[in-house]
Structure formats: structure tokens, C-alpha cells
Amino acid sequence: ELQFDVISKVKDPFLIAADSMNLWIDLFPNDVMELIKKVDIFLLNDEEAMQLCGHDNLDKIVNEFLSYGPKIVIIKMGSKGSLIGFGNEIIRISCVPNVKVIDPTGAGDSFAGGVLGYIAQYGLDDPVKAAMHGTSVASFTVSAFGLENLYDVKLNLIHDKIKEIQIL
């Protein structure tokens, strides 16, 4: 309900994005499905996607979510990378290789922040590049406890890690 209230109060937004979480899906699955209809970008992890749709075919899930109206759907799959759906395409990308995971807490939020930061600067034309940006940012988050690694991250470091990400 809060998300719908916020959306209704924003006048002429550039875009609306939602990043789901298990609690919402557990308590309000119908509301989450309605929320998808109101956003331009929908992000969630693979477990949340399967829980919400009741099956494990992630390509079909991406298409289901896209049919509700978002321009971009991104399913985060942790160490298996992510799945980006837009238009009639579904692209899978890797995570950044050879990252020592110290603490995965906040990786999904960092990923979403990286995606949205890219889109805020460059627009919606390249959702795969946006997801690569998010993947790179998240790689810094998981390689330390808390946010300590993010304080010193510069754009050139983010771009260096993007070069290591593969389209699968």
C-alpha cells in the first residue's frame, strides 16, 4: 500500500522502479503483482521470482512480468549473474569473476543502486549495460563487511570490473 501511495504522489516521474523482497511476497503477493503494472523497472532475486510465479522457469517468469507492463525486468541470481528482460529480449550476464565474497549483505540493494545510477545518467536505452553497472557495484559490496568498500569506489574501478562481465 505504501508503494502505491508514493507512486500516486509523484508528479510526472522520469521512471518508477521497484525492488521486491520476500516479506512483501509472503504477505502481499497480489499487491506485488499489481505493483508490477505500475513500474518501468522491476528487480527481484530468483527465489522471489519463483515464489511469486509458482514455477522455476526464469525465462518464462521474465516474460510474465514483462507482460504486466514494465520496460525492464531484472532477476538477480547471485553468483550465477542476472537475467535482463526488455522488449522481446532476455539476456543473461555473468557476475564479476574471481570476487572473494566476504559478506553478501546489501548486494541486491547495491546492484539496484548501480542499475538506477546508470539509468539516471544514461537513460533506458541499454538495460544490459545498466545491469553490468549494477553487477560491478555489487561486487564491491560483497567483498567486504558493510559498506566499507563502497566509500573508495571510483567510476573507473566500476568500469574496470564491467569489462570482466560476460554476456552468456
PLM ranges: what are they?
Residues 1-41, 46-91, 123-125, 147, ...:
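Ribokinase/PfkB-type carbohydrate-kinase core domain
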Residues 98-163:
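Conserved post-catalytic alpha-helical subdomain immediately downstream of the catalytic base
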Residues 89-100:
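Glycine/charged-rich beta-loop-alpha catalytic/anionic-binding loops adjacent to active sites
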